[in-house]
Amino acid sequence: MEISWGRAMWRNFLGQSPDWYKLALLVFLIVNPFIFLANPFVAGWLLVAEFIFTLAMALKCYPLLPGGLLAIEAVIIGMTSAAHVREEVAANLEVLLLLMFMVAGIYFMKQLLLFIFTRLLLSIRSKMVLSLAFCVAAAFLSAFLDALTVVAVVISVAVGFYGIYHRVASSRGEENDMLDDSHIDPHYKTVLEQFRGFLRSLMMHAGVGTALGGVMTMVGEPQNLIIAKAAGWHFGDFFLRMSPVTVPVLVCGLLTCMLVEKMRWFGYGETLPEKVRDVLQQFDDQSRKKRTRQDKIKLIVQAVIGVWLVTALALHLAEVGLIGLSVIILATALTGVTDEHAIGKAFTESLPFTALLTVFFSIVAVIIDQHLFAPIIQFVLQASEHAQLTLFYLFNGLLSSISDNVFVGTIYINEAKAAMENGAISLKQFELLAVAINTGTNLPSVATPNGQAAFLFLLTSALAPLIRLSYGRMVWMALPYTIVLTLIGLLCVEFTLAPATEWMTQAGWLATLS
């Protein structure tokens, strides 16, 4: 018997999302206009809370859909205007270009990145050294590339290796279902569980590595570029200004990586079983024999393009998004990717998040029009200049651990810049606050998958169920990093940021706008 029209509409609305989630969103959409009529300020804060809720529930439904509905309603009922949304989007065009073109550009360098991580995995026998190598490699790559892409590459390596061993363990060949363990021989099951633990720890080290490297440069994370643009910094300026906080945090993060592996704390410490290593090494040897001269030239070309990418970013030869576009053109032209559909696949990863970021800017427009953060900013600005840095760092960190750090960073840098333009703070203080905001949004956000897009990508990937990586387990494994990164970042913001910045300015390394 066919279902009713009403039931059919209900099932279509937000698709497979739970009924309670659909109902919650409908309640939001119904009550918002009435609350806005009664008290626009309260309605604005309610909208922000609802939007953060959709980000926190990203596993139930991709936030673009519910967040987009809330944003559309906000424009319709007058919380902001379509013209203001357009202005916010136009002001952040560089960030949108970064997401569209840089992420797509790195897609065409995946073969090189896969080659690097595969060599690391099979060449290094010490688990501690291997974990450190994965963390450092992810940090370095994320400083110049998109963190999502770096994590995607590591996921590809892990899924590939897991599938190779699972086929051997189940004796099912090409018909093997990686999610089905029913055909695994009993003596292989223990080895498989150890292999899962090994992959889980490597994925978490790599994920944290992207956060450690991503905070250091203006292209490491989308919000970095927003903050850099607001402060008028180029690539070198940004790196130097962040370094009093980010360099000590990087060192302590790497020490944490070694410590948890050595002590086998928080689910770390599993080694690669020898049986698995033998199978993977055999497969890699066969793959290397099959590699043609054409394949080798592709790897060389991608490496050269990587050098161009780093050089162009460091010397600021063009806007970041345009450098990404040049990578797309060079990588496709020189490696023989000429089919439109093959090129189109590169954009599937970035465009949903680009659309979501545009929705972020709609909510930011509401925050500006309704002056939602005015009381918080006034409270912070009443404190001493030294205390302001700590408060901005903590407020950013708290929000970023439960919400998306791009959203949080955008809000706070806009408010800080408005305070500077109104004469509430000096330019020098604004530049220090920009560092506190950037580090505050990036470092504590490793606490949960909600804050770091790369972590959320890992949690929702095909790999997560294979290696038994759940939301709770991810939070638990991230906990030592969360504590160390947050505390060291806070101490550096409080004690080393201002004097180190002053020293670099006097040494002529930094130029302050006047």
Swiss-Prot record:
It is a multi-pass membrane protein. It is found in: Cell inner membrane. One of its GO terms (molecular function) is sodium:proton antiporter activity. One of its GO terms (cellular component) is plasma membrane. Keywords: Antiport, Cell inner membrane, Cell membrane, Ion transport, Membrane, Sodium, Sodium transport, Transmembrane, Transmembrane helix, Transport. The keyword Transmembrane applies. It catalyses: 2 Na(+)(in) + 3 H(+)(out) = 2 Na(+)(out) + 3 H(+)(in). NCBIfam families: NhaB (TIGR00774), PRK09547.1 (NF007093). Belongs to the NhaB Na(+)/H(+) (TC 2.A.34) antiporter family. PANTHER family: NA(+)_H(+) ANTIPORTER NHAB (PTHR43302:SF1), TRANSPORTER ARSB-RELATED (PTHR43302). This is Na(+)/H(+) antiporter NhaB. It comes from Salmonella agona (strain SL483).
